[in-house]
């Protein structure tokens, strides 16, 4: 039996709704007390890149959660789901900090693809070990990127710095859980 081609509806923005999109990412003319608008917006721009990196990480973790197979399935499947939740919390914290700094966060898929800093996740259905080896690399990338923002902008705003320090600590812990599955018992992954 041949399946029929499904035609899905396509949303088209017209008139007034189209005009609304022109100002979608308009920034405020203010920021938090103690920072200049320029400094607040500079910090928020760096946070936007971290927002995008963490959005991608959350999508990768959920994708692997759905596609992991093999003897470690249930342990890894459940671990990844809890990690998705934690990374999504980080995304929300960063977006809210950006808004507080007066910049509209952009978590839309088009922006994610346009500004991505890592290659497309190459695995579909695969073993836990294969997924975890790749996820470890994506965690390393995100941890390094958080550290770069801290190095360049941490001194400008201690509040954003604290947020990124706490997230980096948690990302390192989540990566430790991944690496515990990869460790050969001699401390090698």
UniProtKB/Swiss-Prot annotation:
Residues passing through the membrane, by range: none
Cited InterPro entries: DPS_DNA-bd, DPS_DNA-bd_CS, Ferritin-like, Ferritin-like_SF, Ferritin_DPS_dom
Described purpose of this protein according to its UniProt entry: May contribute to bacterial adherence, or be involved in the protection of the bacteria, or both.
Protein name: Fine tangled pili major subunit
Source organism of this protein record: Haemophilus ducreyi (strain 35000HP / ATCC 700724)
Subunit structure: Hexamer.
Coiled-coil zones: none
UniProt family annotation: Belongs to the Dps family.
A cellular-component GO term for this protein: pilus
Localization per Swiss-Prot or TrEMBL: Fimbrium
Molecular function GO terms recorded: ferric iron binding; oxidoreductase activity, acting on metal ions
Keywords attached to this entry: Fimbrium
């Amino acid at each position: 039996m041949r399946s029929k081609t499904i035609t899905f509806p396509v949303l088209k923005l017209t008139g007034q709704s189209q005009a609304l999109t022109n100002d979608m990412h308009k920034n405020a003319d203010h920021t938090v007390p103690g920072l200049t608008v320029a400094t607040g917006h500079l910090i928020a721009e760096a946070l936007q890149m971290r927002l995008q990196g963490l959005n991608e990480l959350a999508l990768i973790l959920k994708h692997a959660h759905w596609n992991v197979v093999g003897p470690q399935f249930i342990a890894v499947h459940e671990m990844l789901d809890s990690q998705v939740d934690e990374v999504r919390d980080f995304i929300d914290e960063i977006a809210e900090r950006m808004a507080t700094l007066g910049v509209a966060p952009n978590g839309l898929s088009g922006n994610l693809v346009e500004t991505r800093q890592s290659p497309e996740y190459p695995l579909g259905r695969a073993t836990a070990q294969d997924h975890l080896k790749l996820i470890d690399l994506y965690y390393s990338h995100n941890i390094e990127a958080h550290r770069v923002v801290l190095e360049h902008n941490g001194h400008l705003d201690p509040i954003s710095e604290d947020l990124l320090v706490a997230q980096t600590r948690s990302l390192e812990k989540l990566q430790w859980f991944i690496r515990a599955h990869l460790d050969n018992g001699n401390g090698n992954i």
